[in-house]
Amino acid sequence: MDIITFGWVAVAAFFALSIAFVVWGRNGM
């Protein structure tokens, strides 16, 4: 895997995880 591709995948995963965490936090709390 290319380093640039890995970077984009990491950014996309972090972005999706942060959104999921915020939504889960609002629904949970």
Swiss-Prot record:
Q: Kindly give the InterPro entries that the UniProt entry links to this protein.
A: Cytochr_b6-f_cplx_su8_sf, Cytochrome_b6-f_cplx_su8
UniProt key word Transferase: no
Its keywords, alphabetically, are: Electron transport, Membrane, Photosynthesis, Thylakoid, Transmembrane, Transmembrane helix, Transport
What residue range is the signal peptide?
none
| BP GO annotations | cytochrome complex assembly; photosynthesis
Q: Which GO terms describe its molecular function?
A: electron transporter, transferring electrons within cytochrome b6/f complex of photosystem II activity
Short name of one Pfam family for this protein?
PetN
> Where found in the cell?
Cellular thylakoid membrane
Q: How does it sit in the membrane?
A: Single-pass membrane protein
Q: Which GO terms describe its cellular component?
A: cytochrome b6f complex; plasma membrane-derived thylakoid membrane
Ranges annotated as spanning the membrane:
3-23
**Principal location class:** membrane
Q: What do we know about how this protein assembles, alone or with others?
A: The 4 large subunits of the cytochrome b6-f complex are cytochrome b6, subunit IV (17 kDa polypeptide, PetD), cytochrome f and the Rieske protein, while the 4 small subunits are PetG, PetL, PetM and PetN. The complex functions as a dimer.
Family (UniProt):
Belongs to the PetN family.
Job of this protein: Component of the cytochrome b6-f complex, which mediates electron transfer between photosystem II (PSII) and photosystem I (PSI), cyclic electron flow around PSI, and state transitions.
Q: Which HAMAP family match?
A: Cytb6_f_PetN
Specify the protein name. Cytochrome b6-f complex subunit 8
Q: Which species is this UniProt entry from? A: Synechococcus sp. (strain JA-3-3Ab) (Cyanobacteria bacterium Yellowstone A-Prime)
Q: Give the classification, highest ranks.
A: Bacteria, Bacillati, Cyanobacteriota, Cyanophyceae, Synechococcales
